[in-house]
Amino acid sequence: DFIVDTCMEIVENYDIDAIHFDDYFYISGADDSKTREKYNTEGLSLGDFRRKQVDLFIEDLSNHLRSYNTTNNRCVQLGISPSNVYRNGGYSSTPRYDESGNLISPLYSNTGGFAHYDDYLYSDTLNWINHEWIDYIMPQCYHSLENKYAPYADCIRCWSWAVRYKKVNLYAG
């Protein structure tokens, strides 16, 4: 609630275009064992628990911003700038979607670099895109076309597939 309230205080008191998160959420080595012990009533794994907490935050902030925008005839956006790799894995040249336009495959990019879904950030940005909780995504695609771990073209292609049928803009960072 504190972070959502802080964001809304900024939105309500300053003429801004967006709330933007960059290099966000869980820091490397964070010990939240006492929090998990108290609130993890579903027995989720560390990764699933953390992703759920971040999902709940993003959804809550999104709902607050949409309500504010509707009430005040504004268009303050919510944006995220994640690391360029969602998840590592195999490659497919043809995306597949469900009836809601959610990307079902590939859920992994043809990469071997740091991935924010599993590594310590535990952020399910594809879920945020699928639910349209964010207005834009600006992945940190800083690698060259020839980078062997996270080639630019492979990363940006996967992101373009993820937003194809969603009301989420893709900006290359």
Question: What are the residue ranges of the model-derived segments?
Answer:
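Polysaccharide-binding and catalytic clefts of secreted carbohydrate-active enzymes
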Residues: D1-W133, Y142-H143
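Surface-exposed substrate-engagement region within the catalytic domains
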Residues: H131, L145-G173
